[in-house]
Amino acid sequence: MSNGDAWVIERFGDEGSAIGLAVEAKLHEEQSEFQKIEIYQSRSYGKVMLIDGCFMLSERDHFIYHEMITHPALFSHPAPRRVAIIGGGDCGTLTEVLKHRGVEQAWQIEIDERVTRVSEQYFPELCGSNGDPRAQLLFADGIAWMRERPADSLDVIIIDSTDPVGPAAGLFHPDFYRDCHRALGAQGVLVQQSESPL
């Protein structure tokens, strides 16, 4: 891949569009229990992560996604003390949540522990808050976790998932949203990633 002609391309199904980055090297590839995880060194976006062939983040611009999925929701709530992140295995959203001093508990419920471990290795700047005493990293099914939550036990829910395929498909089902609604307090806020705009 050092010849400058290598590209990683994500194609958007039958829509006739794609996005690609020139890459210098493949740094990591594995098939976890749930999905294929790849890390590349790109020419212009630093390291990039792909899951099942879809771009998840890059060193250069991940902050746009992580800040925007987090801060508007937390600033919209008058006192966001209890925050749940469903997904978010790269830990960037958790890091942004914990910038809010009023947050007392932040749960990150990620089904695939390998996403977090790979992120700790290749994107350590995103994982700096993993040891914060307010953070609880749980490697479990977020759908089942939400089903078990008592009523009025959360202030903010952030659904930081992949697109609605594979293990994330259930995160787009009405039953999951009923469970979220029950778990949120009266002024609760829910925000979610809702697929690529392309």
Predicted feature locations:
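N-terminal auxiliary segments of SAM/dcSAM-dependent transferases
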Residues: 1-48
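The AdoMet/dcAdoMet-binding core of the Class I SAM-like
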Residues: 2-8, 57-192, 198
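Short small-residue beta-strand/loop micro-motif enriched in glycine and branched aliphatics
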Residues: 48-50, 192
